[in-house]
């Protein structure tokens, strides 16, 4: 009887959602048409102040309106995402829509209207034309939580002048390559613990070589490594007995990612329906509470240590957190928010990328051998690498770039137009949400020959002036709103890959065949990646 009751409620919900979405879609079409007419009138009059017009080769003589733009219907999106588990196949749906509608198309998703772009040159034009503070796509639920709890926004959730002010503080400390070099020693200590952990885990297997589900291992490595930089402390993630406080944070982090799908459902449900469907929002808030609590404990702990040093008349030494606390360039609430959001952004993104890189190297032994040979030739088998050593190993950097091309952590990125925009022959009004389809451009044969293949060599420079730049694959974004943690992530992955290859030959395991990606907020492995770490002779 319970399942029958649930089914009846679900059917009623579906009917309500359909009616709601149909109403909202109609209203949005009307609003977008109104915006187009106003924009067209301003264009005709030649008085569009500050507009960035991006003509597309081969476009029609005059801009077309958004009603003429192709795209899936609201009902089709509803069916695809809510009935066919489309949230786990966003990357596939992206490609299907491009094949059907072309490289620019529109979509209605609940109350949101989105124009999707899957053209490398259009993406480049959009990003190069951005102002000083580009606006990302709607993150209303994040803002609502912060308003509810009296929390500040951080770099991921903030917009406008506040975002720009925080960005200017943090970019001076972690965005330039030379700024992150000082963290290499701490990261190498974590890599050493990672190697020890691999040896422990494989010793428990019958063959003495296999590590099952390497992403679980890399998750702990990533969390430990980024915490040494953000919090200036060790968390014990790679110990046999993980501390309780760290386990509680891991639980909150896993809850945040495990409920991605329900959060997406909640985003399409109006606030007035929350009393009837409270669980998604309650769990969303609970996970954020845990993440903020963890950051606050570590920030406050470091603040007490600094004060104790000052009370003793001692010189205060430290890294990123210490520098910000002493300079007071951010308020304490802003610091809590940024540490929380940067840790959230820096764990799964790094662990998934390391998992895919390990998988690709195991599946491509010839490419792996070339990388290893370059390491031995330029560094040796036993030398612990520094950040300064990485430029000597262009293949290591190319492996990371090629891994992120094949498996971009974010299959798409969002922007909101800050001016009326002519793109692909269409007039897109100010305030329109854009989805930049990075997964699809990464696999476009026009931009990458043999796009399905793992070919790190495509990223190598053939001369000192030959810069390999391709907007078909920009996993860290571009311009002022590019990933603030790019250099930190690269450092963690480069140093880990170098030392993994110095110690082990990475081979496929009979337990793992082909692993496909799925979308779970981020692009992640749909199944466990099991590999063999064989000792180097």
Swiss-Prot record:
Its main location: membrane. It catalyses: all-trans-retinol + 2 reduced [adrenodoxin] + O2 + 2 H(+) = all-trans-3,4-didehydroretinol + 2 oxidized [adrenodoxin] + 2 H2O. Keywords: Heme, Iron, Lipid metabolism, Membrane, Metal-binding, Monooxygenase, Oxidoreductase. The keyword rRNA processing does not apply. The keyword Chaperone does not apply. SUPFAM superfamilies: Cytochrome P450. Its EC number is 1.14.19.53. CDD domains: CYP27C1. It is found in: Membrane. It is an enzyme of class 1 (oxidoreductase). GO terms for biological process: C21-steroid hormone biosynthetic process; cellular response to peptide hormone stimulus; cholesterol metabolic process; cortisol metabolic process; glucocorticoid biosynthetic process. Its cofactor is heme. GO terms for cellular component: mitochondrial inner membrane. Heme binds at residue 483. One of its GO terms (molecular function) is heme binding. Expressed in the dorsal third of retinal pigment epithelium, but not in the ventral counterpart (at protein level). It comes from the Eukaryota. InterPro entries: CYP11_CYP27_families, Cyt_P450, Cyt_P450_CS, Cyt_P450_E_grp-I, Cyt_P450_sf. Belongs to the cytochrome P450 family. Efficiently catalyzes the conversion of all-trans retinol (also called vitamin A1, the precursor of 11-cis retinal) to 3,4-didehydroretinol (also called vitamin A2, the precursor of 11-cis 3,4-didehydroretinal), also acts on all-trans retinal and all-trans retinoic acid. The replacement of 11-cis retinal chromophore in photopigments with 11-cis 3,4-didehydroretinal enhances sensitivity to long-wavelength light. This may improve vision in fresh water which is often turbid. This is Cytochrome P450 27C1. It comes from Aquarana catesbeiana. The gene is cyp27c1.
């Amino acid at each position: 009887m319970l399942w029958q009751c649930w089914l009846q409620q679900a059917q009623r919900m579906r009917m309500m959602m359909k009616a709601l979405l149909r109403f909202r879609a109609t209203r949005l079409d009307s609003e977008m048409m109104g915006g187009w007419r106003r924009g067209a009138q301003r264009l005709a009059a030649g008085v569009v102040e500050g507009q960035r017009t991006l003509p597309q080769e081969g476009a029609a003589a005059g801009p077309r309106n958004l009603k003429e733009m192709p795209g899936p219907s609201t009902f089709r999106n509803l069916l695809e995402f809510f009935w066919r588990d489309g949230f786990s196949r966003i990357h596939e749906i992206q490609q299907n829509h491009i094949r059907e509608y072309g490289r620019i198309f529109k979509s209605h998703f609940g109350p949101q209207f989105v124009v999707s772009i899957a053209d490398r040159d259009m993406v480049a034009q959009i990003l190069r034309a951005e102002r000083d503070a580009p606006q990302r796509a709607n993150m209303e639920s994040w803002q609502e939580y912060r308003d509810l709890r009296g929390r500040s926004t951080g770099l991921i959730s903030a917009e406008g002048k506040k975002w720009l002010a925080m960005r200017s503080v943090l970019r001076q400390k972690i965005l330039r390559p030379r700024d992150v070099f000082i963290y290499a020693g701490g990261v190498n200590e974590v890599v050493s613990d990672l190697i020890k952990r691999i040896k422990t885990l494989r010793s428990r297997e019958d063959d003495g070589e296999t590590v099952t589900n390497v992403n679980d291992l890399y998750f702990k490595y990533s969390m430990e490594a980024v915490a040494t930089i953000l919090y200036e402390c060790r968390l014990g993630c790679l110990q046999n007995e993980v501390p309780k406080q760290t386990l509680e944070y891991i639980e909150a982090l896993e809850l945040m990612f495990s409920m991605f799908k329900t959060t997406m459902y909640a985003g399409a449900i109006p606030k007035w329906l929350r009393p009837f469907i409270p669980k998604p929002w309650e769990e969303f808030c609970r996970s954020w509470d845990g993440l903020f609590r963890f950051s606050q404990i570590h920030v406050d702990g470091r603040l007490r240590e600094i004060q104790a040093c000052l009370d003793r008349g001692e010189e205060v030494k430290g890294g990123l957190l210490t520098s910000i606390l002493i300079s007071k360039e951010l308020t304490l609430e802003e610091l809590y928010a940024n540490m929380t959001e940067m840790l959230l952004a820096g764990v799964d993104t790094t662990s998934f990328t390391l998992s895919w890189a390990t998988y690709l190297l195991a599946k491509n032994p010839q490419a792996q051998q070339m990388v290893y040979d370059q390491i031995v030739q330029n560094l040796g088998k036993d030398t612990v690498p520094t950040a300064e050593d990485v430029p000597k190993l262009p293949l290591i950097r190319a492996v990371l770039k090629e891994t992120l091309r094949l498996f971009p952590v974010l299959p798409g990125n969002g922007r909101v137009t800050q001016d009326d925009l002519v793109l692909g022959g269409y007039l897109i009004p100010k305030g329109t949400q854009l989805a930049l389809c990075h997964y699809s451009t990464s696999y476009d044969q026009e931009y990458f020959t043999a796009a399905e293949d793992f070919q790190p060599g495509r990223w190598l420079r053939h001369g000192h002036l030959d810069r390999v730049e391709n907007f078909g694959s920009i996993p860290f974004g571009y311009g002022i709103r590019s990933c603030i943690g790019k250099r930190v992530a690269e450092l963690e992955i480069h140093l880990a890959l170098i030392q993994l290859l110095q110690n082990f030959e990475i081979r496929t395991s009979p337990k793992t065949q082909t692993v496909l990606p799925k979308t779970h907020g981020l692009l992640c492995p749909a199944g466990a990646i099991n590999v063999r770490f064989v000792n180097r002779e």
